[in-house]
Amino acid sequence: MKNIFSIILISTTFTAAVFAQDCGQSFYAMKEKTKITTSNFDGKGKLTGTSEATVKSIQSTANGFVATMEVNAKNEKGKSVVEAKNFDVICENGTIKLDIGSMYLNEMAAQMKGMELTISGTGIDIPATLSEGQTLSDGDSDIKMGSNGMTFMTMKFSIKNRKVEKKEKITVAAGTYDAYKITYDMDMKVLFKKSIKAVQWLVPSIGMIKSETYNAKGELEGTTEMTKFEQ
């Protein structure tokens, strides 16, 4: 189960960069062999894990393209927790979408044989042009697990109150960038409900270079930042 949530964390990192109005102008690094390495830290700044995402291939379609991404993740000790999991980034008629369902299902299938799994949701979007004060749409995702037509467990994720606060220069381990700062609220419900507040910094043609999550008391719970960008 821990690996499932690792995948969810990684994939939501990439969903910060999707859905441009032009397939060639997305907040996403759409070039073959591009590799983005990120590091995760707890609220006290202690390393909790790293992940790598590589654009393996890009294929043109009648209305856009399909890019295949490969994700690898390691814990703080360098041990793999998610190894070589693929998902597709699909651009169709100017909208980019993530097809991460198969990645969830492949990981869950190995841990929960005999379980029936369904995934649904609206996703999130990022317009090709951002401006300070701009309000962005909400998004959600549900993962249901069951057997013989009965649901045993439902995981719900919803993102709301997304807003572009400002554009600012920010420095991470990978370098200094002009980034858009976006804030939002996220509700997660698995065995219990948890609400967090988050901040993300997005850079055109790269994606999210940093994020911070805070608990209901406003205390920093974790940070993710890009430590290497190879293209």
How should these model regions be labeled?
Residues I4-T15:
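Sec-dependent N-terminal signal peptides
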Residues V18, D22, I119-S120:
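General secondary-structure propensity
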